Amino acid sequence: MHLNFGFSAVQILWTLTFAALLVLLVVLLGRDRVRRFPWFTASMALMALRMVASRLLFGKMAPIVSNEIFLALAVVAALVALLVVVEMARRAFSSASRTAWITATLVLVAVGGVVLAAWGPWPSAKTLFAGSTLGVLRLMQLIAQKAETLADLLVIQLGILVVLFGRRFHAGWRSHVQQIVIGLSTAAMAQLAVRGIWQVIALHTTIHSRADYVRVMALEEKLFNADSVVFLAALVWWIVCLWIDEPGSKAAGAPAETAPAVAEQLLPDADEEESQAEPLPSDAK
């Protein structure tokens, strides 16, 4: 017996991802995590906005206008992703010395810059700086792609540093910072792996017939669906981890702190006992 749900894998993953994003935003707001991670919250809200915009506006507007909207959102999302990396680094290594900060920043940016320079083809300057709307759109697309790739490279390196040295700077396994960085780095590794595999396939595959084209497009869909599954797992990981308070936080230590106060309320005060006690009869003269 074959069950036909009438929904494709892309539609199911889109629905589950969007629902998980909404739940994560509720957890961030309800559990008061926004104060510690404002840029991470903004990135999740922006991702939900992009998903809604792609579902509602794609194919219903002029191509130039829709491309301008989607590319503008992509550029903003890429810049926010870079700010998320900075935010997580500051939270994880806030007690590190200035020298360590400068050294680690230079090393991470240098490694990320070298990999970014070698990653993928770069368009020519004439194509980017042509005085036309199409040239502007290509420049926006390049900025969004390269900034997002740089953010992925930086967050992967940051994840390695947090896992190795986070405990020394009070960012251990059960801290929200390390849990968020683990999810970000896992999603970034999956995204870069899918991009790399698809780039190799696109460069070394020759289409001879329509069947070959359909087969390659089906492979592309499977790759991006796998990336979506990894990101969905990261969303579930964040929901569970951010719902639970960190060890030693005020919310986690509330019962232990309120116990002495309750005991003081239950035990009578010594002054009240003396005032309520009956006076002893005086000695007869």
Residue ranges of predicted features:
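Hydrophobic transmembrane alpha-helical segments in integral membrane proteins
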Residues: 1-19
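Short aromatic-rich membrane-water interface segments that cap or initiate transmembrane helices
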Residues: 2-8, 67-76, 135-150, 214-224
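Short, hydrophobic transmembrane alpha-helix segments
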Residues: 3-4, 24-34, 56-61
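Internal transmembrane alpha-helix with an interfacial aromatic "cap," most often the third helix
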Residues: 21-29, 61-62, 73-108, 114-130, ...
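Membrane-interfacial loop-to-transmembrane alpha-helix junctions, especially the N-terminal start
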Residues: 32-43, 100-104, 174-184
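Hydrophobic alpha-helical transmembrane segments of multi-pass membrane proteins
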Residues: 38-57, 77, 184-199
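Helix-loop junctions on the outward
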Residues: 49-70, 197-209
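C-terminal transmembrane-bundle signature of multipass membrane proteins
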Residues: 161-285
